């Protein structure tokens, strides 16, 4: 689930933090990186749990209304399609989800007001109204309802994103990426797979985890060497006016260019130029592109870089 885009973001953040703290302990910083990646994976499960929690809350609300003094006919006989959703019932029994949630201690139990706000947002949506009116009653309809809710109501919702950012500092830059993986998971669910339905693993393969660790280590262990090369190519720039994050981005980009021969140079450059646009100044992308392009040409002339 954790792709290389997210890995690069996390490495940049931890390398930046490492220097801000005054060149701390490398092993401690590496553990912080792995912890940060684990938190991204937690968020994936929190999104899946959110579906179950809002359903459970609505079930409790309907049950409470039935038991109140002099309930109306509508309260005694509510439309239960939302709480009887077959996709949600399957998700709630998923073996992998239950195991991970139990092991990591994940829960929305202290966030009832937030869950209530999410539920109200869903219940007031046109998607919900259409779902109740839909004459087709099937597992596919139930799953599609939640796919649409997640895509159009939850993803990009400012209230939800702000709450998640406040809930964990590790999620500030993860939400949009992790939302796409939760959405893909909903789409892949099949009724016949029951509780054995596969969820996304933390890493697609061991190679991605190794990529994260190696990129981080090389960025710091050879940081002095990379900084000297960067400084040489910035002689026409006013160094004191260059954002510190620009230097970090170029340093990590060089670590990737020189440490991973199978990754095309243009792929690496594009990824870090995009990161610069997001994490640094508006002009950083152009500046970083120019410096890195100059360094790459120099490395090729020195026969230190043999890939394209």
Residue ranges and their predicted role:
Residues 1-308:
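Class I Rossmann-like S-adenosyl-L-methionine
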């Amino acid at each position: 689930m954790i792709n290389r885009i997210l890995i690069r973001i996390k490495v940049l953040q931890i390398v930046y933090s490492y220097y801000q703290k005054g060149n701390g302990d490398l092993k401690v910083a590496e553990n912080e990186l792995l912890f940060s990646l684990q938190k991204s994976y937690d968020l994936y499960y929190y999104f899946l749990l959110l579906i179950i929690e809002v359903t459970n809350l609505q079930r409790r609300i309907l049950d409470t209304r039935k038991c109140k003094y002099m309930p109306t006919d509508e309260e005694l006989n509510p439309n239960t399609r939302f709480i009887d959703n077959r996709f949600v019932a399957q998700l709630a029994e998923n073996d992998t989800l239950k195991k991970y949630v139990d092991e990591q201690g994940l829960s929305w139990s202290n966030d009832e007001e937030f869950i209530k706000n999410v539920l109200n947002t869903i219940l007031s949506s046109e998607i919900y109204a259409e779902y109740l009116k839909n004459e087709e009653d099937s597992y596919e309809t139930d799953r599609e309802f939640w796919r649409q809710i997640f895509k159009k109501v939850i993803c990009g919702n400012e209230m939800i994103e702000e709450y998640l950012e406040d809930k964990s500092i590790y999620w500030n830059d993860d939400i949009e990426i992790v939302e796409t993986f939760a959405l893909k998971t909903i789409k892949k669910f099949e009724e016949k797979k029951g509780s054995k339905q596969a969820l996304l693993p933390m890493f697609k393969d061991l190679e991605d985890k190794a990529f994260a660790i190696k990129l981080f280590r090389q960025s710091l262990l050879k940081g002095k060497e990379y900084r000297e090369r960067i400084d040489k190519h910035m002689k026409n720039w006013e160094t004191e006016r260059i954002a510190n994050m620009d230097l970090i981005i170029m340093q990590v980009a060089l670590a990737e260019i020189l440490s991973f021969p199978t990754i095309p140079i243009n792929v690496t450059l594009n990824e870090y130029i995009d990161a610069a646009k997001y994490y640094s100044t508006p002009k950083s992308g152009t500046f970083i592109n120019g410096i890195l392009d100059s360094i790459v040409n120099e490395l090729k002339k020195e026969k230190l870089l043999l890939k394209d």
